[in-house]
Curated annotation (Swiss-Prot):
HAMAP family: RNase_HII_A. GO terms for biological process: DNA replication, removal of RNA primer; mismatch repair. Keywords: Cytoplasm, Endonuclease, Hydrolase, Manganese, Metal-binding, Nuclease. This is Ribonuclease HII. It comes from Pyrobaculum arsenaticum (strain DSM 13514 / JCM 11321 / PZ6). Gene3D superfamilies: Ribonuclease H-like superfamily/Ribonuclease H. Its EC number is 3.1.26.4. Its cofactor is Mn(2+); Mg(2+).
Amino acid sequence: MTLSVGGIDEAGRGPVVGPLVLAIVVGDSEALSKIGVRDSKSLSPRAREVLYGKILEMAVCVNYAVVEPYEIDLHVSRGMLNALEMKYAAKLMELCPADLYYVDSPDVKAARFGDGLSFLTGRRVVSLHKGEAVPQVAAASIVAKVVRDRLVEMLRKEVGDFGSGYPSDRKTREWLRGGRIPHECVRWSWETVGKLFK
């Protein structure tokens, strides 16, 4: 009997603007490798979109979760961002059952995140740094990035151009200082945001 394998990854952990998106893909390693899945950061936006369509067509299960800034703020203020990611990863695992899951770990101690997720779900979990070497994780990274990019584009139409959304981006900092800031799209708990208003 063939082992079913799932991969989980996220997009948007670092920006001060917009949501965090986690995604899961359950599918055949060889088939995913053949279509060219790899770390979403190494692909152009167009290549990601093309692969996203192919992943949806061929995977056994694909799903994602959107974590809004207010929920991120709530958990960051208590030092529990990794716990928040674990909670959403567990929900995705319920939606896409598999025999084994590979997860790109947000924790500096990859095994700690994997052990926690395994304990929470009762499933077999292997947590890795650079997890995109596993085709299912690479596919999940593409799904998460495409979904987040689309949400960010919608946000830009609503609130104006805020640059990359990263605190190192001058355009993002100027937009934050500009005052027309809907609370719900900014991660106020980020230290760099607090410094701007001191």
